Structure formats: structure tokens, C-alpha cells
From Swiss-Prot:
Protein name as annotated: Protein-L-isoaspartate O-methyltransferase 2
Tissues expressing the protein: Expressed in rosette leaves, stems, cauline leaves, flowers and developing seeds.
Enzyme nomenclature, EC number: 2.1.1.77
Keywords, in A-Z order: Methyltransferase, Nucleus, S-adenosyl-L-methionine, Transferase
Active-site residue list: S144
Main function: Catalyzes the methyl esterification of L-isoaspartyl residues in peptides and proteins that result from spontaneous decomposition of normal L-aspartyl and L-asparaginyl residues. It plays a role in the repair and/or degradation of damaged proteins.
Annotated localization: Nucleus
Record's catalysed reaction(s): [protein]-L-isoaspartate + S-adenosyl-L-methionine = [protein]-L-isoaspartate alpha-methyl ester + S-adenosyl-L-homocysteine
PROSITE patterns: PCMT (PS01279)
Family that this chain belongs to: Belongs to the methyltransferase superfamily. L-isoaspartyl/D-aspartyl protein methyltransferase family.
């Protein structure tokens, strides 16, 4: 065998070896989802991948997407694993346990509240309530994914002690509003606002079937039809304000209704959005920091929403 033949065979072997490596890498990459820019949240690197904010209409079983952080070629990825979370009490328990396992929930209070209030009562019949994804609720609106509810509850937890006041803008089917009520108790006050009357009616019926029903009956929890961009002045100021849709800028009425020492969590931006945490100082000035990249429906008028934005 001459030198040229040996060289050609070596080249072929090397090309074959490289092809195998590339195919193996591609296969591994397909099973992983690249994270959006990571942030430090709850003592660890965490960021919700954009894929988790989209609804998978082909999913008919109650499966929870486990989030397993690992390193590959110096980058962080989420492994998407399927977990049978079941239905009812076993479903919500499985959902919460997995959010705890992967570092999304670190607060005992938040875990207890999300397990107490059954998400299955707040999604349309036939939807996968315990999958970590947003679910369409009609009227061009969605109920946020469980990991976003958990994130917002933890960001607002210090402002949701018994006796405090909370405003939920874009209250939808009422799930997060009900969570707020469980946290501030009967001596507190929780207000949900949505500009779609049918969703407000739906949220009231949902809460009436839940563990938060007593707060609705007592009057410490109320849901109203209105333009959430204007807040709800009647029970202001609020210790905590949550906005469930993305605004291009912070609505001034919401800032005005935020109590000094209070906190607002709001997604800001158009196509590229960030979840902002706004703390109002005692002198009325504000401090803003970015928590993570997100993707929400826009905070807009009822006409624009029903028209598909």
C-alpha cells in the first residue's frame, strides 16, 4: 500500500469519525432547548425557555414538563422530560413537587398555596391543567404557565402577608387572584380586574368552586370588569400589584395606586419582553430591576384584544 493510499484512508476514517460526532451532537441538541439569557433567581441560575410559554394543542394527557438543568458545550439547556402528574389532587401535587425539584419554587408558602388551589378548576374542560405551559381560555387570552405563576407569587410574597392588599390586572380565569386571597387572608383585600365580562363571570364561578370561595363570599376578594391599565382605585393603595399582560411602558395609574413600600410585577416590551419588578420607596420614587425574559399577550383595549391585537 503506497503512501497516498494510506493518507486517503486516514482522511476517510477521520471524516467518518467527525460525521459520527456531528450526528451525535445534533441528536443531543434536538432533545434540548437553549435557554434565553440566564438570570439569578432564588439562589440559582434560572430562566424559563420561550418554548415553555407556548401552548401545545396536541397534548391531551396531563403531563408535566420537568426542567432539568445541565451544561453542554459551555451553555445551559433545559432537558424536556415528561412526567405523568395525574389529575385532581395528585396532579396539582405533582406539578408543585416538580416546580420545587427544579428550583422554580423555593418558598414553602407558595408551594402550599399552589397545591391548595386546584389549577384544574381554572382551565377549560379538557385542557391539560398541570402541564407547564399557558392554556388558551378564549377571547385571545391565556392562563399563564405554572412556572410563571410560581415566579410571580415568589416575587410578591413579601407583599402578600395577612391583612395586605393586592391587585391582579388581567385576572383571566381567576387562578392567581385566588392564590393572592389565600395568602393575604380574610383580613386582607384582593381585587381582580379584567376587561372581558365573560372571563370575569367565569373567574367568579371558578373561585366559588375552590378553597378561596369563602373570601369571595365575605367580600375580601372581588372581581370586576374594567380597563386594567387604569387599575382599581376603590381599594387602593395596594401592597402588591400583578399585571398579567405586557405593557409598552408602566401605566401611571398603576404606579399611583401602588402603596409606598409596595411592589409591582409587570412584563414590559412589545415583541421582546422582560418581567420587571418595581419597588416603590417611601418617598414615592421607584426602583426597577429585570427578573427574566418572558412572552405575554399585550396589555391593550378590549376591542384590540378581541380583534386579535
Amino acid at each position: 500500500m503506497n503512501t497516498n493510499t494510506q493518507t486517503e484512508q486516514q482522511i476517510i476514517r477521520e471524516e467518518t469519525r467527525i460525521d459520527k460526532i456531528i450526528k451525535k451532537r445534533k441528536k443531543k441538541m434536538r432533545a434540548q432547548v437553549l435557554l434565553c439569557p440566564t438570570i439569578t433567581a432564588y439562589g440559582r441560575l434560572y430562566c424559563a425557555p420561550r418554548r415553555l410559554h407556548r401552548y401545545n394543542s396536541s397534548s391531551s394527557s396531563s403531563q408535566f414538563l420537568n426542567l432539568n438543568l445541565s451544561r453542554f458545550s459551555g451553555a445551559l439547556f433545559f432537558h424536556m422530560e415528561q412526567f405523568q402528574s395525574g389529575t385532581g389532587s395528585s396532579g396539582k401535587r405533582g406539578m408543585v413537587e416538580n416546580l420545587k425539584r427544579y428550583g422554580v419554587i423555593s418558598s414553602k408558602r407558595v408551594a402550599q398555596v399552589m397545591e391548595a388551589l386546584d389549577r384544574g378548576l381554572f382551565v377549560p374542560v379538557g385542557s391539560s391543567a398541570y402541564v407547564d405551559t399557558p392554556v388558551p381560555i378564549g377571547y385571545n387570552a391565556t392562563i399563564s404557565a405554572p412556572h410563571m405563576h410560581a415566579t410571580c407569587l415568589q416575587l410578591l410574597e413579601d407583599k402578600l402577608h395577612p391583612g395586605m392588599r393586592a391587585l391582579d390586572v388581567g385576572s383571566g380565569t381567576g387562578y392567581l387572584t385566588g392564590c393572592f386571597a389565600l395568602m393575604v387572608g380574610a383580613e386582607g383585600r384582593v381585587v381582580g380586574v379584567d376587561h372581558i365580562p365573560e372571563l370575569v363571570d367565569m373567574s367568579i364561578k371558578n373561585i366559588e368552586k375552590s378553597v378561596a370561595a369563602s373570601f369571595l363570599k365575605k367580600g375580601s376578594l372581588s372581581l370586576h370588569v374594567g380597563d386594567g391599565r387604569k387599575g382599581w382605585q376603590e381599594f387602593a393603595p395596594y401592597d402588591a400589584i400583578h399585571v398579567g399582560a405586557a405593557a409598552s411602558e408602566i401605566p401611571q395609574p398603576l404606579l399611583d395606586q401602588l402603596k409606598p413600600g409596595g411592589r409591582m410585577v409587570i412584563p414590559l416590551g412589545t415583541y421582546f419582553q422582560e418581567l420587571k419588578v418595581i419597588d416603590k420607596n417611601e418617598d414615592g420614587s421607584i426602583k426597577v430591576h429585570t427578573e427574566t425574559s418572558v412572552r405575554y399577550v399585550p396589555l391593550t383595549s378590549r376591542v384590540e384584544q378581541l380583534g386579535g391585537f
